[in-house]
């Protein structure tokens, strides 16, 4: 609880800016911010990596140390969460498509769940090199997967020999591992959201090469200069990621609802 008390004093110094979480007045916003920071603490977002693994570029976002690990400044987490959500809402309003990437055990479920609920794309098992930079080839493999899944629903499988059925299943499962969440993706996404910088570095590098805006969760061993938009926070916990991705989902839906209203009017 000591960390929360120290953090509460920082809330009074938050800049008065309009964000996706803006309230009717500054006093009301202070109350909301304090509640959010407490919720972030309960979700474990303040828990950084081992101090010996830290990246000095993350110093502005670190509050201190505790039992050999860095403690992330949750006021910074809140401010950057607001900025990211405003960006996602704006991009959704423009009609941009989103790709969620998280291939670790604790991030896989969060990424898939958020992508499905926002009608977005996802990669949650393994990132295949060239998935974006060599999209022409990747797209052919996506089509192949769709074709195999279609055949699976017919009587075609019954006509195959045991070996042919095994080969069919092996190819289908291999393609599902890489492309299941990309089955409806016809072109490159407008924004890529990464559950972790270090764990999803290959995907991040492809975004940089293609100049696709990226949103990344940064732990204390990450490099903030590599990401277009980022949020300092614990990237090693399902609970922490689920907390942040819930706000991503709401921001995207808010932007799309605004776009729909503009279309109707």
Curated annotation (Swiss-Prot):
Keywords assigned by UniProt, alphabetized: Chloroplast, Plastid, Ribonucleoprotein, Ribosomal protein
Gene Ontology CC annotation, any one: chloroplast
Biological processes annotated in GO: translation
Major localization listed first in the record, in broad terms: plastid
Membrane-crossing residue ranges in chain numbering: none
Localization terms from the record: Plastid, Chloroplast
InterPro entries with a match to the protein in the record: Ribosomal_uS2 (IPR001865), Ribosomal_uS2_bac/mit/plastid (IPR005706), Ribosomal_uS2_flav_dom_sf (IPR023591)
Pfam families with a match to the protein in the record: Ribosomal_S2
One MF term in the entry's GO annotations: structural constituent of ribosome
PANTHER family for this protein: 30S RIBOSOMAL PROTEIN S2 PROKARYOTIC AND ORGANELLAR, SMALL RIBOSOMAL SUBUNIT PROTEIN US2M
Protein family according to the UniProt entry: Belongs to the universal ribosomal protein uS2 family.
Name of the protein in question: Small ribosomal subunit protein uS2c
